[in-house]
Amino acid sequence: MTDVRLPLRALGPFATGSIGMGIWVTVPGLFLLYFLTDVLAVPPLAAGLVILVPNIIDVVLHPWVGRLSDTDLARRGHRRRLMFTGCLVVLAFVALFAVPAGLRGIPAAVWVAVVFVAGNLLYSCYQVPYLATPADLDIGYHERTRLMGYRNVVITIGVLLSGVTAPLLTGDDPGVGDYTLMALILGAAMLVAMVAGITGVTRLKQAAPGTPPEPGHRTGLLVALRDRQFRALTASYLTVAITMNLVLAGMPYFAKYELGRATLTTVLVAAFMAPAVLATPLWVLVARRIGKQRGLLAAQAGFVAGSLVLALGSAAGLPVLIGAVAVLGMAFAAMQLMPLSMVPDVIAASGPGGTARAGSYTGLWTAAEATGGALGPYAYSACLALGGFVASTADEQTTQSPGALAAVRYGFTLVPAALMTVAIMLQRRYTLDNTANTGSSGLGLRDHSMQTVLPGEPSDAT
């Protein structure tokens, strides 16, 4: 069993890399559907397909990228080559919102879809080796939670800042030019953060090098697919990813059509993300006290409760709704931290040579995340279409029917509550944490000498 403590000089840059990832996930997740329907006049179902189809393609590519990452590790001793390639996602991020003048409706949808396919592929080249890093390191059960705790705090800050900054940069009733300026500014921040993340990965590998994999390993995907614990964990996470991406896509609509002011999107994002930042260190302590699985189930139940309160709509009053969104944010922190720190546990328990399969496991995991990114906005767009929502351009004023307004509200609240209930049932099938949290020699899952250090707390390894 290992007692390695990861130094802050490595944890900081590694966590910083997730800011770039957070911008790519958050800004399109929060604004792309709205950008298509309310700026480019793309009908809701077509707009949903623009997000769905590229992400379906992405699902197929992620396991392949995972295999490439494992091959790089075996041949070169690191996964950084793909990460440098992935930094080019910044170009796709800018192009996504820099739609050529005159393109509206279906032609604009085609432009966005093509760029989104390229961007998702480049993003996976960075994301897959980045998230494989914890499994590559010679660290224990609690240190994995500590590592992902740092990462979770920083990515949540990145999501908060980008989610709040983007609406401020675009303003009220923005046009394509406003979105392009926003993409240029946030794209520059993406690039700086992602390069820092590569530095962090290098330092982590120096601090806790794992067992070098043997070249020619070819069983990672099959082992991952046959792993019952991994399947249970991934199925639940897929449902969570669908739910969270639906919520992100629905926020601008809920602010504009239910609360009456589009600018309240910034307030909702802040109310969601700020508690998530503050709650992450507490969830690290919860994981140490009662285990990751129990903490995750409690967070999922809290999310269901908060969604049901939001279903009351504007009649509940803005303070109550903001409080409910804050509950969702605190639950979101656990739903990011716990599963991502459980994946390396599963890999460690999968048998000898787990490091050589980490990219394959992570590729399948990020494929599930990409599926959630596709199905969440599409599910919300389907709700809008069923309610009779009418698309428009930025300079048009469209009055929505009562059915469309009901779809805006309940698609944002009751549908996520139902999906999260399904996620809870799937998550209960995961049982590895019972063994990991009570001690299991030979799996590298238990480390009695480890002290969990929260973000910002001094470490004797620095």
Question: What residue spans do the PLM features occupy?
Answer:
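Membrane-embedded alpha-helical bundles of multi-pass transporters/translocases
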Residues: 2-444, 453-454, 461-462
